[in-house]
Regions:
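Short, conserved catalytic/metal-binding motifs centered on acidic residues
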Residues: 63, 78-79, 105, 109, ...
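Short amphipathic alpha-helical "interface-anchor" segments enriched in bulky aromatics
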Residues: 352-387
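A short, flexible helix-boundary coil/loop motif
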Residues: 85, 297-305, 377-391, 396, ...
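Charged, often Cys/His-bearing segments associated with DNA-binding zinc-finger transcription factors
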Residues: 1-35
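Electropositive, glycine- and tryptophan-enriched low-complexity nucleic-acid-binding patches
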Residues: 174-242
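Gly/serine-rich nucleotide phosphate-binding loop at the start of the catalytic core
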Residues: 27, 32-103
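An anionic, glycine-rich sequence signature occurring as long contiguous blocks
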Residues: 269-365
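Active-site-proximal, Lys/Arg-enriched surface segment
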Residues: 110-200
């Protein structure tokens, strides 16, 4: 089926484009959702000597945010693209720095990020997320109208042939040289991300744990599970009253993670694989084989078959609650049939009434997880691009990208070009870059930005 935008004439598309305010709409959304953003940046502990500072922290941080929103890949490209008077004028309004008369140099930004504690930017992100959580407009996305869905997943960021820093993770790969197999070391940096589901199409960074070795003398790499324990412990302190449903792939479907969730009163929906929890898998199959599973046919988008068994942990001799459920359906091709099957573990009591919503929640994790990281890696942000070789600056660049992504997701959900003509994310960012470089923000625009506005998201 064609999308709405495919039926529009070119003339109608041009008419929709005329309604686009470009960078002014981004500024309006920042004012609407994060009115004190520049203040939050300026309240960070400034690592610079006061007598040597020309730019405020908000000047520097917001320039980094705009670099990401406008899909500018490199620091050099930012230097060239942002050297325009409208950029200076717009950044002055965003940061509130009336003395700003020139864009900061990219080296100035990198030098600042080399010294700034990543906890400072993480704290700004926390304030942004709490501001969004308080808004009732996102409540409809809670699971059963109660639990905020938090998805955790790890991804690789940077890879090096030689040791980059003392915190590098290391792996050994086999490659062929002169007809012989040679084992060589490769060094890399990895991150564990917790994403908060606010609405369809809006899944924002909630917290980040960098997976790294404490020093170069450790005998074993830091791993995702250890990082997950640190991240979940911090989430419990930062959001002590937030009703959470944790979601993750089969890597996290282990008792230590489930125990942490139970200790904090959280729910969990974790992908199940027999290779990860063999005893549970065997007991589920044994109970189902004896007719102990509840089955519902014709559910889900594909009208497939759902099945569940509560408290499999009792027969498996496990401590943590393991209510298990699955969903399977067939797709037909040219004379062939393909079976698709998914299975999850949860501590939510399963019933015939809630099974379909639980299936949609479980399947949604994969889509959100892959779209989120795929867009950041291969879309407008290209988080694997090295903006600095300094390990501290690398972390801060990553966190600035997460802050920018929160703003950008809100804009994409609001943008008339996305909603009206289905413009791609990359083209939307390109138009924002041109708007930032060419559009003069007028007094009328400032009035539009600062007055109370009802914002309708897709």
């Amino acid at each position: 089926m064609k999308k709405k935008a495919d039926w529009m004439t070119k003339a109608k598309k041009r008419k929709v484009k005329k309604k686009d305010r470009g960078i002014v709409d981004v500024m309006m959304l920042m004012q609407h959702y994060f009115k004190e953003l520049s203040l939050w940046f300026n309240e960070m502990t400034d690592p610079r000597h006061p007598s040597y500072t020309t730019y405020t922290q908000a000047d520097l941080a917001l320039m980094g945010v705009m670099k990401n929103i406008c899909a500018v890949k490199s620091m050099r490209s930012m230097e060239e693209n942002f050297n325009e008077q409208p950029c200076i004028d717009t950044l002055r309004i965003l940061s509130g720095d009336r003395k700003l008369n020139e864009m900061p140099h990219s080296d100035t930004l990198n030098y600042y990020l080399e010294q700034l504690s990543p906890m400072c930017l993480a704290d700004v992100r926390k304030k942004m997320v709490k501001s969004l959580i308080r808004r009732k407009v996102f409540y409809h996305s809670k699971l059963f109208g109660k639990y905020w869905r938090i998805i955790i997943d790890g991804t690789g960021l940077f890879y090096f042939r030689e040791k980059h820093c003392e915190n590098c993770l290391v792996t050994t790969i086999t490659r062929e040289e002169d007809g012989k197999e040679v084992r060589v070391k490769r060094y890399y940096h990895k991150v564990l991300e917790a994403k908060l589901v606010l609405a369809p199409g809006i899944t924002v960074s909630l917290d980040t744990e960098f997976i790294e070795n404490e020093n170069e003398d450790v005998s074993k790499n830091d791993c995702e599970l250890n990082a997950a324990k640190r991240l979940l412990d911090r989430l419990s302190r930062d959001y002590p009253r937030l009703p959470i449903c944790l979601q993750g792939d089969a890597l996290y479907a282990v008792e230590p993670i489930m125990e942490i969730c139970r200790g904090h009163g959280w729910k969990y929906i974790l992908t199940h694989k027999a290779s990860r929890q063999k005893v549970l898998a065997e007991n589920y199959a044994w109970i189902a084989g004896g007719g102990g599973a509840q089955t519902i046919k014709g559910i889900g988008k594909e009208r497939g078959r759902g099945e569940y068994i509560n408290h499999v942990e009792e027969s498996a001799g496990k401590k943590e609650e393991a209510n298990m459920y699955s969903y399977r359906y067939e797709t037909k091709g040219a004379g062939t049939k393909e079976l698709h099957e998914f299975q999850w573990i949860t501590n939510i009591e399963l019933t015939r009434k809630n099974l379909e919503e639980m299936i949609e929640a479980g399947r949604g994790r994969w889509k959100i997880e892959n779209e989120g990281f795929n867009n950041q890696k291969n879309g407008i942000y290209e988080i694997e691009h090295l903006n600095s070789r300094n390990s501290n600056a690398m972390k801060n660049h990553y966190l600035i990208t997460q802050i920018a992504d929160i703003i950008m997701q809100l804009y994409l959900s609001f943008s008339p070009l996305r909603r009206g003509i289905g413009q791609s994310i990359k083209n939307t960012s390109s138009r924002l870059l041109e708007s930032f470089r060419r559009q003069t923000v007028t007094d009328e625009d400032v009035s539009y930005i600062t007055r109370y506005t009802t914002v309708y998201l897709e």
